Design a protein with these regions (language model features):
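Hydrophobic/aromatic beta-strand patches that form the interior of the parallel beta-sheet core
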Residues: 6, 34, 53, 102-104
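Structured adenosyl-cofactor binding patch, chiefly the S-adenosyl-L-methionine
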Residues: 94-140
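S-adenosyl-L-methionine/SAH cofactor-binding core of RNA-modifying enzymes
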Residues: 28-83
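Conserved strand-to-helix beginnings and helix N-cap segments that scaffold or border functional pockets
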Residues: 16-20, 64-68, 97, 117
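Catalytic beta-strand/loop module used to bind and position nucleotide/cofactor moieties
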Residues: 66-95, 100-111
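Short glycine-rich anion-binding loops that position phosphate/pyrophosphate groups of nucleotides
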Residues: 11, 57-60, 88-92
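Short hydrophobic segments within beta-strands
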Residues: 6-8, 55, 85
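N-terminal beta1-alpha1 ligand-phosphate binding loop
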Residues: 1-24
């Protein structure tokens, strides 16, 4: 299962960028990061079995264990790609949200998209660590 982060805006050399790099390097699963301009830009084609997850403040509050279970189920079901979409400052419109398989929220607060990218990278590392029975995640 490819973990594909598609994000609006360039993270560049920043504290958030360093965090993203740190967690992506730790991941044992294949990862791709695609950066798009804040507006426009061509979204990568959706090929084969792909699940679209959009980060959105109206989305599902998903504990780390639930995210791990979802990724594990997709992997076991032969899903080829889990595509995690991070919008620009204004997020996604209703039509874009309707095309998502999952709307995922990191809480009801609004997060800067660069920080949301770092949080997503950490949660993906945590979820894959849970699936590998690695001691990184501590429940409770």
């Amino acid at each position: 299962l490819l973990l594909h982060i598609v994000a609006r805006g360039r993270i560049g050399r920043s504290a958030e960028g360093e965090l993203v790099d740190r967690y992506v390097k730790r991941l044992s699963w294949p990862v791709r990061i695609t950066e798009l301009p804040d507006t426009g830009g061509k979204l990568p084609l959706v090929e084969g079995q792909t699940r679209i997850v959009m980060l959105d403040e109206r989305g599902e509050l998903m504990p780390s264990l639930a995210l791990a279970e979802r990724l594990g189920r997709w992997r076991d079901d032969g899903v080829r790609e889990a595509r995690f979409m991070i919008g620009a400052a204004d997020g996604f419109d209703a039509a874009e949200r309707a095309r998502a398989d999952v709307l995922l929220s990191f809480g009801r607060a609004t997060w800067p998209h660069m920080l949301a990218r770092a949080m997503l990278a950490e949660q993906l590392y945590r979820a894959t660590s849970i699936l590998a029975n690695h001691p990184y995640h501590r429940e409770g």
